[in-house]
Amino acid sequence: MSKDQIIEAIKEMTVLELNDLVKAIEEEFGVTAAAPVAVAGGAAEGGAAEQTEFDVVLESAGSSKIGVIKVVREITGLGLKEAKALVDGAPAPIKEGVAKEEAEEIKGKLEEAGASVELK
């Protein structure tokens, strides 16, 4: 019997017959059908965990470079020269490892000044 013939036979089975088949395979080969599903489910849950720390990354200064430099100075506490170098070097991280609320606030200020910002 080929693999295709087995698949066709399975397609014709009812749900109860499939349940019996799974139980018979588990007993015959000493395996459980639930174990791989549980492992895959656990991995998916781990990937779906909500991120708690964000990096605010300046993608570009846009058309209002001076306004963006002022906001970067306000946020980071850098001097004019350092803030300008940071803005000129975009894409560049502005703040790293900040809470979601603070990251959203910083993003809002920078976008208001005309910058393009991404949270990572």
Curated annotation (Swiss-Prot):
Q: What are the record's GO terms for cellular component?
A: cytosolic large ribosomal subunit
Keywords for this entry? Ribonucleoprotein, Ribosomal protein
> Keyword Metal-binding: yes or no?
no
Question: GO molecular-function annotation terms?
Answer: mRNA binding; structural constituent of ribosome
> Would you kindly state one Gene Ontology biological process term found in this protein's UniProt entry?
translation
Which Gene3D superfamilies does the entry link to?
Answer: 3.30.1390.10, Single helix bin
Superkingdom, natural source: Bacteria
- Presence of keyword Ribonucleoprotein: yes
Q: What does this protein do?
A: Forms part of the ribosomal stalk which helps the ribosome interact with GTP-bound translation factors. Is thus essential for accurate translation.
The record's subunit annotation is: Homodimer. Part of the ribosomal stalk of the 50S ribosomal subunit. Forms a multimeric L10(L12)X complex, where L10 forms an elongated spine to which 2 to 4 L12 dimers bind in a sequential fashion. Binds GTP-bound translation factors.
Protein name per Swiss-Prot or TrEMBL: Large ribosomal subunit protein bL12
